[in-house]
Amino acid sequence: MMAVAEASQESLKQRLNVSGGNGLKGTLRVSGAKNSALVLMTASLLSEETIELTNIPSLTDIDGMSAILESLGVQVDRQSDCIRLTAAELSGSAPPYELVNSLRASFFSIGPLLGRLGHAQVPLPGGCRIGARPVVEHIRGLKALGAVVNVEHGIVTASVPGSKKRLTGAQIVLDCPSVGATETILMAAVLADGVSTIENAAQEPEVQDLANLLNSMGGQVSGAGGPLITVQGVERLRGCSNYPVIPDRIEAGTFLMAAAITRSPLVVEPVIPEHLSAVIQKLRDCGCSIQIKGRAVTITPGEITAVDITTQPFPGFPTDLQAPFMALMCTAKGTSVISEKIYENRLQHVAELQRMGASIRLEGSTAIVEGVAQLSAAPVTGTDLRAAAAMVLAGLSAKGITEVAGLKHLDRGYDDLEAKLSAAGAEVKRNIP
């Protein structure tokens, strides 16, 4: 627990010095998906047997989730990109606030704890400060499955009434296709009595990855990846070995945009192309040639021209790539309109890009971006995870050396970003005071 806090404090003091004007070359390797790995780790709470996950990225968020699971009695064994989780005997159902506060994904523990133990007490989550990300849908779904849920003083307490301590299958219709709510309900329903359906379910690849893991553990989940998911509850789930986390589509998209903003031909792999269809289409629209061969994506940028994007749930353009794409559009020919429809406070990077000479006008949750000939280096701060990535990308194309602060955010979601970029020809150096 202390080690996680110390790592976060250390990264607060660090800066990333990014020298602009260097092209990229070769291949950038994509790590396992952060947003999938965190949820799959919490699924270990559903079984008494060992869950072995591979292709786990090296991130502070993974360290934080490991600490949360250990606080609940899970044995965690991490070796390189493999993690073994054994929840044979859980010692508690209430993860501590000091761990949960910095990691939004910690709230995913409520579904497995409730499904297996019949009770859970989880503080409301933390993570990036990019606007309201309520858990109303999560709670409504748990109540539909028969849980009694109370929220008081920032803590969500949930329990299953009766002697069986077992949830009951139900028909659940989400008001919006929330990824977190879909995954929470899915993990709670897998051990419930009877059949559950989730209508208007999130269709993101990370939901599919969770369903695939649960099925490999003996669950009966069908329809994941579509708007209707059906879950036939089972008595128990077994362990599983060597389950690979899907490649991180957001990291892959960031790398493709790094190639585009530096006007560099590059290979990005491994990528599941259908996970990035909307992004690949927009990159093609703005002047990039993209070739796909298996899980390798080769991008060859031409003249970059402005295109418009609107963030949407999958399979639309992902909100997590809005900031990096805006950095690219700052260097494009023409005017682009970027509309953020998922989170109301996810345009904080605009002010930082303006410090680098970007021409951006805000109208509510929409940014109008006039491309400029070249950005100029400046000291900037990544105000959240994806904003930090956008600052790095802007620095790669800017004149001079850009100093990027806010690395605690970057380290939450990008596995050794500076080393990967440096290996591809960028001049990126972490300044440790």
UniProtKB/Swiss-Prot annotation:
CDD domains: UdpNAET (cd01555). Its main location: cytoplasm. Pathway: Cell wall biogenesis; peptidoglycan biosynthesis. It is found in: Cytoplasm. Its EC number is 2.5.1.7. One of its GO terms (cellular component) is cytoplasm. Phosphoenolpyruvate binds at residues 34-35. GO terms for biological process: cell division; cell wall organization; peptidoglycan biosynthetic process; regulation of cell shape; UDP-N-acetylgalactosamine biosynthetic process. InterPro entries: Enolpyruvate_Tfrase_dom, Enolpyruvate_Tfrase_sf, MurA_subfamily, RNA3'P_cycl/enolpyr_Trfase_a/b, UDP_GlcNAc_COvinyl_MurA. GO terms for molecular function: UDP-N-acetylglucosamine 1-carboxyvinyltransferase activity. Belongs to the EPSP synthase family. MurA subfamily. This is UDP-N-acetylglucosamine 1-carboxyvinyltransferase. It comes from Synechococcus sp. (strain CC9605). The lineage of its organism: Bacteria, Bacillati, Cyanobacteriota, Cyanophyceae, Synechococcales.
